[in-house]
Amino acid sequence: MWVSSPDPSDIQARVKALTEARGVPMLGENDVPPLLADAVVATEDERFYSHHGIDSIGLSRALLYDVTNLCLCQGGSTITAQLAKDVYLGGSDRGYNKVKDMALALKIERVLTKRQILADYLSEITTGYGHYGVTEAACVYFHAPLGSLTLGQYALLAGVTQAPSIYDPTVNPDAARQRRSQVLAQMVAEHYITAAQRDKANAEPVVAAGPGC
């Protein structure tokens, strides 16, 4: 079913309903720690602050890869498109819905700030086995408030969100450490942190406290 044009109250109400149903907090645009925002943008959507919902460069690159490899391997999706897919389309990855989530992403970008889009996305994403949102992830993995984590912990969270079943530090600490290193390297490449900060964060142990807060 096609979705009508979203407006701020519509999408905010939907995200609120999702987070309330899952028992996790909904982040406001000022609640996302800057280092976490930098880590997520650097690794998931490097042109997030310059595109309008669709990253034409990333989409073209993904299309070329898929055509060359005869597969639907790369989606070229943006953070905004992912939010649209999760909130309006139930997270479906079917090709038919990719057109819808891109169209919705363009509309969402007209009515929400970049900071609120990122906050909504980080409020509702899957972050582990039955866990949702980065606030719960910080509690589950580190037994700490979201705003009090280290650079290494933020990088680990950013890595977990892309593939929770693979990078969950309570299940695969070695994979989580490797992914954290990749996130930190990308943050250096995008000029969010220095090489010295990267090295210090890479030296942090991957300490996962396990389920419960």
What are these regions (language model features)?
Residues 1-213:
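Juxtamembrane regions of bacterial inner-membrane/periplasmic proteins
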